[in-house]
Amino acid sequence: MKQYLDLEKYVLENGTQKGDRTGTGTISTFGYQMRFDLQEGFPIMTTKRVPFKLVVSELLWFLHGDTNIRYLLQHNNNIWNEWAFERFVKSADYKGEDMTDFGLRAERDPAFKEVYQAEMEQFKTRILEDEGFANKYGELGNIYGKQWREWKTSQGETIDQLADVIEMIKTNPNSRRLIVSAWNPEDIPNMALPPCHSLFQFYVADGKLSCQLYQRSADIFLGVPFNIASYALLTHLIAREVGLDVGEFIHTMGDAHLYNNHIEQVKEQLSRTPHALPKLVLSDKPTTIFDFDVADISLDGYHPDPAIKAPISV
């Protein structure tokens, strides 16, 4: 997608070198927006393969209000493992090798990488096979799904923001309050990772549903391709339920950054030519967005270039 490649190029050419929480370092810009017309095809990278089923299972995990990686692992989705693992290795229950700064050390030290990978595999197996262990160490805190579906009020009640917004789209589509927020300051200290994609808003006009996302922190090479596909999919699912066509997905970013250890991968991607976008295919079986299974969602005509691997910064 040209919009995304333009973002990569802009940050490479105009970004500022900055330090960051992970110690990796970034090239960063502040305030950038991309627009995608969802009528023109499903916006997923074609200049590198994005594992769409992982996008689907993560979004369904959010929609279920789940915050435990066990569901993700049951669907062969490993994208949240590092944050749960980090909590475990910092606990008194962990008795293995020192895992301080495991992400950076695994990237730089092949011997340590083998130890880390073995510890991670043991951790994943325990999450899948030991429900008690999963309940304790598979939890990531009150992250996205919990805030979307069970925002806690000062009176001890809960608000299902997503269900409320869907109902409002049906009954009052001209509302300017079609907003869901994952940014709950009270819960931030207890989250494994504070929400990067923090708030989204819907807009109805001319029989079409559009969505704008505000993302406070945007990992351009690894995270943003998932975010684009995820929120485009969410827009399609809700539009289907409320009887609207899809309009635009607008992606607004705060700190949009390229990690220093992703620069060569970005240059490789920029050397590639985008292909035609695929079409989203949804099963007729589910009646609401909360009824979908992974098998109900697929892409037709997705023929991307090969994946480009890059390390994740934790």
Curated annotation (Swiss-Prot):
Which GO BP terms sit in this record? dTMP biosynthetic process; dTTP biosynthetic process; methylation
Has keyword Cytoplasm?
yes
Q: Does the keyword Methyltransferase apply?
A: yes
UniProt: dUMP binding residues: R21, R176, R177, R216, S217, A218, D219, N227, H257, L258, Y259
Reaction catalysis annotation = dUMP + (6R)-5,10-methylene-5,6,7,8-tetrahydrofolate = 7,8-dihydrofolate + dTMP
Per the Swiss-Prot or TrEMBL record, the active site comprises C196 (nucleophile)
- Binding residues annotated for (6R)-5,10-methylene-5,6,7,8-tetrahydrofolate, in chain numbering: D219, S313
Q: Where does the protein end up? A: Cytoplasm
User: What broad class of enzyme is this?
Assistant: transferase
The protein's annotated pathway: Pyrimidine metabolism; dTTP biosynthesis
First-listed, main subcellular location of the protein, grouped into a coarse class: cytoplasm
Q: Name one GO cellular component term.
A: cytosol
Looking up InterPro entries in the UniProt record yields:
Thymidate_synth/dCMP_Mease (IPR045097), Thymidate_synth/dCMP_Mease_dom (IPR023451), Thymidate_synth/dCMP_Mease_sf (IPR036926), Thymidylate_synthase (IPR000398), Thymidylate_synthase_AS (IPR020940)
Task: List the Gene Ontology MF annotations in alphabetical order.
Answer: thymidylate synthase activity
Which residues fall in a coiled-coil region? none
Write out the similarity annotation: Belongs to the thymidylate synthase family. Bacterial-type ThyA subfamily.
User: What is known about its subunit structure?
Assistant: Homodimer.
Reported function? Catalyzes the reductive methylation of 2'-deoxyuridine-5'-monophosphate (dUMP) to 2'-deoxythymidine-5'-monophosphate (dTMP) while utilizing 5,10-methylenetetrahydrofolate (mTHF) as the methyl donor and reductant in the reaction, yielding dihydrofolate (DHF) as a by-product. This enzymatic reaction provides an intracellular de novo source of dTMP, an essential precursor for DNA biosynthesis.
Q: What's the protein here called?
A: Thymidylate synthase
The gene designation is thyA
